[in-house]
């Protein structure tokens, strides 16, 4: 266990986050350093031994095609060259030297020079690289055979000290536009893939977690096994109209056949504002105001003796001097993240169980906590369990359960309005609160301090429960090799509950002092000393059903054929309809298919289609056909 101080500046959220990682894994591998050196743009020949002989050569792939920019290094020396566009190279070496030939995606070869003066190197692809699979629409494909535009994000890049996964996407992938609309604790971000492709509100990408449409922000980053983004028509056609804005595929971790392994991670960090608007101070504001009134009316609105009272704080009740930024914001707040997961299993049963807690405070400065606590804070508890059971040698049953419980405490009202009031209120408009405890409010405008400390508070409670059951049958021995079928059913429940405790106290404006020096007040607003309670409930229920057949087979070491046919259905209902219902139907149904072919894993062809329908459209426009075709060469 080690402590690691990490500093990350998030310009999207406008916070600086310094995270102390109490538990982290550091992998140092000398071969990685060599691999990076081989991928430099240019490796210049170093003539440190003029007595050597000159050797020419050519680097070819497994099909005899030249490989440009392949790296040739002399083992144990700082000498090397790269091949030209024809795959040829020239290097000066000794007969006892060994040449290390490498290229991205190919097996590295080491060749003894000896008496050779012309060397032909035939590279072979890395077997692991070709056999590696990547997550695609409705399943997985060998990475070498994927034609569509699919990007995968490393899990280390997603492990940001943020509350929601969407907030950590900024800058991780080309073509992803991320917008953080709020800096509140627990706030997520909106993002788009290759811009906005749909008019109206429904312009966000489709997010699928383990093949089920769900929110990305409900997944803890420690539970993610793979994160892929589908960008073009070839990759998204199977989802039809729902894939018009791109697709995010998230696969969660599952158990492996091994002894139980426990992983724990604890983070504690700080957040503080790093970029705030620069507001005029009291002296600057008075000067600007006097310049305006002098230009328009020929006289000063604030005389020099009054200006001195504002600047000297001789009577802050009648001549306030308030820095609203310093008053309403603290220097920093803290964040805490704790995650623990257990994975393991036997040949029959494999499991992954994980839980996490996240807490984030706010930099808003709540100074009055005597009657109630309106401080802003966010807490999230997450749980996930994935279990895979081999019912028979060819039948697998998978059960996934997850739950996310979130709580948020905040001042009542709109924080965006509070921010606007803070910007618009002048430093001499009103004190935060009068010295005798009377609530202050200017004759015109508002007091941002009251909006933060004396308007009440709200409590939000959110609960998301998700379940998924999947049954996979391998028909390779019963029907034909490479044939599998899968049935998947999910049921999700979302509930939200908000309690608003509202206070509308009377506020006053001081006009001067009486003979005894007491403040004279004029009532600005008439309120009540009682607290009012309101509450709202909302919730949804979502059912997904999917049945598919998949075929993947290699014939004669040359021809690889794949096919997929799928039926899907989704039903979404509002569990707490209000007085206004925007739509009655939230149902989608459709079929999809994919056919793939590759020759020697070098030439590829792929056809996809989606035929989808929705009750949100007119009866004669409910279904649409969305095909795509692609060919590729590697």
Task: Spell out what each predicted region is.
Residues 1-383, 397:
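Short, small/polar-rich motifs associated with maturation and membrane association
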Residues 164, 188, 245, 335-339, ...:
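Transmembrane beta-barrel architecture of outer-membrane proteins
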Residues 179, 320-343, 429-440, 503-618:
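Outer-membrane beta-barrel transmembrane domain signature of Gram-negative proteins
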Residues 252, 264, 340-346, 385-389, ...:
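Residues on the lipid-exposed face of transmembrane beta-strands in outer-membrane beta-barrel proteins
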Residues 255-260, 347-348, 363, 394, ...:
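Short loop/turn motifs that connect adjacent beta-strands in outer-membrane beta-barrel proteins
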Residues 264-270, 355-357, 399-403, 487-493, ...:
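Transmembrane beta-barrel strands of outer-membrane/channel proteins
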Residues 273-275, 316-356, 360-363, 374-448, ...:
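Flexible loop and strand-edge segments within Gram-negative outer membrane beta-barrel domains
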Residues 279-285, 369-374, 414-424, 500-511, ...:
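Flexible, surface-exposed loop regions and adjacent strand-edge segments
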């Amino acid at each position: 266990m080690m402590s690691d101080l990490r500093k990350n500046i998030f310009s999207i959220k406008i916070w600086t986050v310094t995270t102390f990682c109490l538990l982290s894994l550091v992998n140092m591998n000398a071969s990685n350093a060599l691999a990076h050196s081989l991928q430099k743009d240019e490796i210049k020949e170093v003539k440190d031994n003029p007595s050597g002989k000159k050797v020419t050569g050519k680097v070819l792939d497994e099909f005899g095609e030249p490989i440009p920019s392949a790296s040739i290094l002399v083992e144990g020396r700082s000498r090397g060259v790269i091949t030209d566009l024809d795959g040829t190279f020239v290097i000066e070496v000794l007969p006892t030297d060994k040449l290390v030939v490498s290229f991205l995606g190919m097996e590295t070869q080491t060749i003894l020079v000896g008496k050779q003066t012309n060397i032909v190197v035939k590279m072979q692809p890395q077997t692991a690289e070709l056999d590696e699979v990547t997550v695609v629409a409705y399943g997985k494909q060998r990475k070498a055979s994927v034609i569509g535009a699919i990007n995968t994000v490393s899990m280390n890049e997603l492990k940001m000290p943020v509350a929601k996964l969407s907030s950590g996407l900024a800058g991780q992938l080309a073509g992803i536009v991320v917008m953080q609309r709020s800096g509140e604790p627990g706030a997520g971000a909106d993002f788009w893939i290759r811009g906005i492709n749909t008019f109206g509100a429904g312009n966000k990408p489709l997010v699928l977690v383990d093949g089920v449409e769900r929110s990305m922000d409900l997944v803890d980053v420690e539970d993610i096994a793979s994160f892929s983004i589908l960008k073009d028509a070839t990759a998204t056609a199977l989802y039809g109209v729902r894939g018009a804005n791109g697709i995010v595929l998230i696969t969660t971790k599952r158990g492996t056949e091994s002894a139980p392994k426990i992983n724990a991670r604890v983070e504690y960090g700080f957040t503080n504002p790093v970029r705030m608007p620069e507001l005029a101070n009291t002296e600057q504001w008075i000067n600007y105001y006097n310049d305006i009134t002098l230009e328009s009316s020929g006289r000063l609105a604030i005389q020099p003796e009054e200006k001195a009272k504002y600047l000297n704080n001789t009577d802050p009740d009648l001549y306030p001097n308030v820095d609203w930024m310093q008053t309403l914001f603290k220097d920093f707040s803290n964040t805490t993240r704790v995650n623990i997961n257990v994975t393991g299993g036997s040949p029959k049963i494999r499991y992954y169980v994980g839980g996490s807690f996240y807490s984030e405070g706010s930099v808003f400065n709540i100074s009055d906590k005597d009657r109630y606590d309106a401080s802003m804070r966010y807490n999230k508890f997450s749980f996930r369990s994935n279990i895979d059971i081999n019912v028979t040698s060819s039948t697998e049953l998978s059960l996934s359960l997850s739950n996310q419980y979130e709580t948020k405490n905040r001042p009542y009202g709109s924080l965006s309005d509070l921010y606007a009031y803070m910007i618009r209120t002048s430093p001499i408009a009103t004190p935060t609160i009068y010295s005798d405890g009377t609530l202050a409010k200017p004759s015109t405008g508002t007091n941002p301090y009251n909006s933060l400390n004396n308007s009440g508070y709200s409590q939000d409670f959110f609960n998301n429960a998700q379940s998924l059951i999947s049954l996979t049958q391998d028909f390779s021995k019963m029907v034909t090799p490479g044939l599998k079928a899968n049935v998947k059913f999910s049921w999700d429940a979302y509930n939200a509950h908000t309690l608003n405790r509202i206070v509308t106290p009377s506020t006053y404006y001081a006009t001067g002092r009486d003979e005894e020096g007491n403040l004279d007040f004029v009532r600005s607003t008439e309120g009540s000393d009682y607290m009012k309670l309101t509450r709202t409930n909302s919730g949804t229920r979502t059912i997904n059903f999917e049945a598919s057949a998949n075929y993947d087979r290699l014939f004669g070491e040359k021809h690889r054929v794949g096919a997929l046919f799928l039926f899907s259905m989704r039903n979404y209902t509002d569990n707490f309809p209000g007085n206004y219902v925007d739509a009655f139907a939230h149902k989608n149904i459709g079929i999809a298919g994919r056919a793939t072919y590759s020759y020697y894993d070098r030439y590829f062809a792929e056809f996809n289609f989606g035929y989808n329908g929705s009750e949100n459209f007119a009866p004669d426009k409910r279904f649409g056909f969305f095909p795509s075709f692609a060919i590729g060469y590697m």
